[in-house]
Amino acid sequence: MHRGYEKLAEVRSYPQITTLVNRIDWVAGFSNEIPFIAGAERLMEIEVPERAKHIRLILNEMARISSHFVFNGAYALEVGALTPIFYAMEDRERVLDLIESVTGGRFHPNFNRIGGVKPAAGAGPTSKKNIQDLPAGFYRDTKVAMEKVIEAADQFQNLIGGNEVFKKRTKNVGVLTAETAEAYGVSGPILRASGVKSDLRTQTDYLPYDQFDYDIPTGENGDCYDRWDVRVKEMVESAKIVLQAIDSMPSGPLQAKVPKVIKVPKGRTYVSCLLYTSDAADENPS
């Protein structure tokens, strides 16, 4: 399942590679399409329409929420709490339904295209003059779902985060200091749980995150509890981003003009998936 992606990509066209990369992470497949697509677009010097960027951003945050639901529910299960995983899966289904209504896939969206996104799977008939990019009722259903996500995160905090048994089994356990995290190149929620306020969304322009207001949750102790807590709080921030993106959705096309035969020019580019780069790494590149 996770073998030979680079070799497989050598014998496929650029549009076909999208179906490979979203299988790298089955829990948040949509997010894996973004780096490859953005890298190809940079090499081809393609400017993606703003509406397509917003749709990508919304689905990217939904994928993040879906992933965090799995982690938070399974994490509680690992320390002896059986019930939370069922609540997590129920709430996650609501988010997956939205992703499926747009992309046609729950785990493997294959939705991004070099230069934009494809028409929504649940949008009904399309024509060259009028392409339905989002299914009917998507805005309404998304707002309801995101409010439910915020409620679910609050429920997680009350039922699990405040549980004395859970705290005893996670607090001051598996401590990862900020210094050690930086030294080993740790990124994402694990790095932020160690107290480093660093997030790819604020450091690059691969999606228009700079247009929205949100916080970057961090931990204090870098222990097992903080790594759980940061993800719960991130679900709330992701829901806030989605709600803002829905309210500010621009009009316009879904796809930039691209050649019928996609051929990325020879060159080198880098779309960062690393959420933190230390000063030492900058001074001593390897």
Ranges and model annotations:
Residues 276, 280-286:
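Single conserved hydrophobic/aromatic residue that forms the stacking wall/gate
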Residues 1-278:
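Active-site bordering "gate/hinge" segments
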